[in-house]
């Protein structure tokens, strides 16, 4: 971890160090980000449960006594069709940048640095945000064409972040090293794009529970209006269907549980029948996965009308240590000391 997770200044604009130094040996940098600006690159590291203890109970690295209580094995949810080759992992890296080539460069070099000690189990390249994380951002759209993440936690909501995202030292005696960090839920969700595209607009909006254009709840108002789940139409039926995604996923319907989503859309080409392999790479930071994510996803998997158009194919849960100073220290240092 010290070798790959210590802050460096190679992302500074104009720095060519490593990519062109030396002639006889392999370069210390792969070089595809030469001449590119840092592009607001961020790198987030997570630790999987298997790093601490395997499913068979083997303590490979002497870390079992520091396994966080909340770093659980996510249950199998109804309808899951998980690919083991796209699930789990000892470590996780989320690299984000305004330029995808800069993000790929970061991951590529981490894999190069880790050669011989770690190898890539699976990866996913995403594009475009699927949730706004700041009040200054507009709500983006997912590949179904709807605004996604309207009720997402925002960076300016410090009290909410403290309550729902950041781990407190008192949360777990065995995981004091994780204080100031979080837990990352990762789910690769394939979308049946072609089926969705043949669905009427009225049905699409009923499935989501919001208007497609403005993103307003079907109970009325603008995008950020509080959904009125008790409101009914002239036929006596709820304006927001009880099987809609909004009804089942909104914090008001989940005992106030909120998530900080930071996911992305993805397309991985098409299959032999010309169908897009596309969807949502769902990424959410939470303080307590068993309380905030599992109950909500159980309800969605069981009752969400949108499940007809989705297939969960990959899954993971990771403990995300707090960040490090600009100089000195490395990610996860408190765990390994």
Regions found by a protein language model. Give the residues of each.
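Long, histidine/aromatic-enriched segments associated with O2/redox biology
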Residues: 2-337
């Amino acid at each position: 971890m010290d070798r790959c997770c210590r802050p460096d200044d190679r992302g500074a604009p104009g720095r060519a160090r490593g990519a062109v130094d030396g002639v006889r040996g392999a370069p210390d940098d792969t070089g595809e980000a030469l001449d590119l600006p840092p592009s607001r690159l961020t790198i987030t590291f997570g630790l999987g449960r298997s790093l601490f203890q395997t499913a068979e109970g083997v303590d490979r690295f002497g870390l079992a006594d520091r396994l966080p209580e909340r770093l659980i094995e996510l249950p199998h949810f109804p309808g899951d069709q998980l690919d083991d080759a796209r699930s789990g992992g000892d470590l996780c890296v989320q690299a984000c940048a305004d330029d995808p080539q800069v993000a790929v460069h970061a991951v590529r070099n981490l894999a190069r640095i880790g050669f011989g000690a770690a190898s890539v189990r699976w990866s996913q390249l995403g594009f475009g945000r699927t949730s706004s994380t700041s009040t200054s951002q507009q709500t983006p759209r997912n590949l179904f064409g709807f605004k996604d993440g309207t009720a997402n936690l925002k960076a300016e909501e410090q009290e909410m972040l403290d309550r729902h995202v950041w781990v407190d030292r008192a949360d777990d005696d065995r995981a004091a090293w994780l204080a100031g960090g979080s837990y990352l839920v990762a789910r690769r969700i394939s979308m049946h794009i072609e089926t969705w595209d043949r669905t009427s607009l009225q049905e699409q909006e009923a499935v989501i529970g919001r208007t497609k254009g403005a993103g307003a709840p079907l109970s009325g108002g603008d995008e950020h209006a509080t959904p009125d789940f008790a409101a009914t139409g002239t036929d006596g039926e709820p304006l927001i269907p009880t099987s809609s995604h909004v009804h089942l996923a909104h914090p008001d319907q989940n005992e106030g549980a909120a998530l900080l989503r930071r996911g992305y859309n993805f397309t991985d080409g098409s299959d032999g029948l010309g169908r897009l392999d596309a969807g949502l790479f769902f990424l959410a930071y939470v303080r307590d996965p068993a309380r905030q994510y599992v109950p909500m996803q159980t309800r969605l998997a069981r009752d969400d009308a949108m499940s007809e158009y989705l297939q969960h194919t990959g899954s993971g849960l990771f403990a995300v240590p707090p960040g490090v100073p600009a100089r000195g220290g490395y990610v996860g240092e408190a765990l390994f000391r």
